[in-house]
Amino acid sequence: MPDQWWIRYDGGPKFSLRLGLTSFKHVGVFPEQAANWDYIFRQTSDVAAKTGSRPKVLNLFAYTGAASLAAKCAGADVTHLDSVRQVVTWAHENQDRSGLRDIRWVVEDAMKFAGREARRGNLYQGIILDPPAYGHGPDGEKWKLDECLFDMMKTVGKILAPENSFLVLNLYSNGFSAILGETVVRQALGLPADSSLESGELVLRDRFGKNLPLSIFVRLKR
């Protein structure tokens, strides 16, 4: 088995991803996320069509960048942030192999960056979050999902444009259900009852038709 290899995603967006064996037991992609990639591509395209401008999309905890590439394929100005320089470099390779360019790369703690953007009054038409259950920022900042998620979402609510915008939250922690994730987003952002909010599970289906649930998602469309 090779140490590294490339695959091509040809769903709504079309891009290339380098896969490889790593010391942290990942291969560079979580394939169940394809449903989110297609959603991000569609929503970014819709916002661009409605506004006649390039949507600003922020991808937090962005890993190797498939969601960033999906937004970029739809014409967004993308900011890709992760606290691990190694995976940001990996994401940059994926951008180059995909024939894309001009993604903004940031190695920083997500909470710090989002808070600074809020203080500056910067707004994004798309925000994507895929936070881990536990983690550390580049300067030793500690992240624990069940303690930090609500505050993170409150801050994100301050930088998400009030109209013609979307949000995608993905959660892998076993302590969160789709209903709980949706409740956190609704309360943190102060959303009315009739908000266009959806949640559910992302699964992989085997050749026998059995579903393997792997994560939950919460999506908001404005």
Predicted segment positions?
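Mobile active-site "lid"/loop adjacent to the S-adenosyl-L-methionine
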Residues: Q86-V87, V107, Y124-T155
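S-adenosyl-L-methionine
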Residues: V84-I128
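Conserved SAM-binding motif I beta-strand of class I
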Residues: D77-D82
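Conserved class I S-adenosyl-L-methionine
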Residues: G52-Y63
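Helix-to-beta-strand junctions that scaffold the AdoMet/dcAdoMet cofactor pocket
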Residues: L160-P162
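Conserved SAM-binding loop of SAM-dependent methyltransferases across substrates and taxa
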Residues: T64-A76
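Non-catalytic substrate-recognition/targeting regions of SAM-dependent transferases
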Residues: M1-P31, D38
